[in-house]
Amino acid sequence: MGKIKKKGTSGQAKNYITRTQAVRKLQISLPDFRRLCIFKGIYPREPRNKKKASKTSTPNTTFYYTKDIQYLLHEPLLRKFREQKAVAKKIARSLGRGEVGDAARLEKNHAPKLTLDHVIKERYPTFIDALRDLDDALSLLFLFANLPSTAHVPPKTIALCQRLCHEFQHYLITTNSLRKSFLSIKGIYYQATIQGQDILWLVPYRFVQRVNGDVDYRIMATFVDFYTTLLGFVNFRLYSSIGLRYPPKFDTRSDENGAELAAFTLEGRGVGDAPKAIEAGNTQATTSTNNKEVSKEIQAKVDNVIKSAGLDEAKEEPAAETTEESSETIDKFEPAAPEADTLPQPDLSGNEAGSLFAPFTFYISREAPRAPLEFILRAFGCKRIGWDAVLGDGAFTHDETDTRITHQIVDRPQLPESSLPAIPAASKDGSDAVQKVKPGTRIPGRTYVQPQWVWDCINEGRLVRPDLYAPGATLPPHLSPWVKPSRGGYDPKASLAEQEEEGEAELDEDSDEEMEEATSDKKAEAKADVGSESEDEDESVDGGMDVAGTDDDESESEDEEEDFDGFEEEAASESEDEEEAARTQHQKELEAEAAGLPFSSNGATSDGSKKKASQAKKIAAKKRKEEEELERQKMMMSRKKRKLLEKMIYSNKKQSEEAAKLRSKRRKLEKGAAK
């Protein structure tokens, strides 16, 4: 007979451990335990049965894997936490004795500093692993870079986050790795491709942030400590991969004047070259630039060698041209059949992204968001960006009347000239040397666009029409570049004629007309009811007492209460009505012919209604036929496949209904705009 197993020695009770037991086992405080778990990437787990996992009668709420806690026993950070606890006791003892100087000395010189380098190496064995986990790090660091300094968020933390974020942005600008961006309610989404990994992060808008007290900034500060170390490692590796020195030179005075990205100076090879991606595997660009620098003498010798060898130049040149074209352009994948799935197309390469805004000179007005526009324009090849001196240093020009400016980004409404302020007078000391332009004026030879034009251009991968984004114009919808239209769904970019079903527009018009007629009938009935009520009030006598009805009223009520005689009388009455309508229509046609006038009023409407009715019948018959065919096909299926098909049909029907609602809404908006 086997031994009876003791409770809590196997199963879930052995695999899981409560948080209280873990804190006792590690001999640290609960805040230090939280920090240690965040640094090491250990999170609470949910057992299948909490009663079995718990060794006590009450089911606990927080559980961890026992192996994870066993793994934490050998962590070097535990020693640092214990040293911090010992120093904190000494500082408290000194403050209790009134020795403030000793307490300050202990805090400054003897407080142990945590280093997370070994934690980063343990959690991310390869650089690709670090890139995959960079989304949350960038989102949190960009958030703290835009927060105001408070007691919970010190200025040093904000400055560190700003410096790391600007360094990462400089790498994206140098290598043209930024691919897409989207303006949302939460903030601005960015997507970059680094070594084949897509990185997506969120940057908040630069509004005045109100720090609430319900946010636990201690937990967030722990994540910031970890992510700053991670981003420092990543930036060093990225800068080293393209031959740049890290960290780059930082001008404090320029940063205080609002230069931001311009406060950094990159040093190393490849900084002054053309705006192309500088990567180890990108050897085609370097070979092409080296070939252009070959002297004429060497080229002549090569030509002589080719002629002496008897090679056909005519055959070699087109081959070279085709190889160059294939290396510069991106292949487009087309579906084999029109009903096949849409194939995902490749994104822009670094060279194409670096030349999108390269030939232009931009000027950012004061009301436009300078920081995101500068980052996007520089990441897509623009080298000359100017703005007003109020926005900070680092601009290509502060003169709005510069003739080299080709595009100006404006985000203000169109106002009449009478309401515009006058040009401010220049100062006497001559410090205001730059000429001021009257607000709202247009300088010839320049394209004025709204900020959305920049985002739509980079998402489309080409320059879109700037007249659609003129100042004061109604902007086209700003769509997410990551949401692709599915088959049968609503596509806001396509026209209604391309995506609506057969007869959908006519049916929608008929339903709208019926709704309008119903509302007009309701209004007429309401007016008639009001009139009848007023007549009843006038006819009421004897203080509202009931008056006996006459014999005529009784006979009318008896006639109304006659028995139902069946559908034959209704059919006969309908046929009589149709004959009467045809007779009256023929009579009107004869009268119009005798008067010499064209008969088109009632005839056209009746013909149109007949056509619509016949078309609706055809569509209904077609749908009925398709449903019958589908039912016959379902009869040949097994029960499992039939259930799966019904689920698919249900989901597709829901999607088509939502798409039809959106198309109907768009149809009404277009009609209203046309009127």
Swiss-Prot record:
GO terms (BP aspect): maturation of 5.8S rRNA from tricistronic rRNA transcript (SSU-rRNA, 5.8S rRNA, LSU-rRNA); maturation of LSU-rRNA from tricistronic rRNA transcript (SSU-rRNA, 5.8S rRNA, LSU-rRNA)
Biased composition (Acidic residues): 498-518, 532-541, 549-580
Keywords, ordered alphabetically: Coiled coil, Nucleus, Ribosome biogenesis, rRNA processing
InterPro entries: BRCT_dom (IPR001357), BRCT_dom_sf (IPR036420), PES (IPR010613)
UniProt GO MF annotations: ribonucleoprotein complex binding; RNA binding
Quaternary structure (record): Component of the NOP7 complex, composed of erb1, nop7 and ytm1. The complex is held together by erb1, which interacts with nop7 via its N-terminal domain and with ytm1 via a high-affinity interaction between the seven-bladed beta-propeller domains of the 2 proteins. The NOP7 complex associates with the 66S pre-ribosome.
Name of this chain's protein: Pescadillo homolog
Lineage start: Eukaryota, Fungi, Dikarya, Ascomycota, Pezizomycotina
Gene: nop7
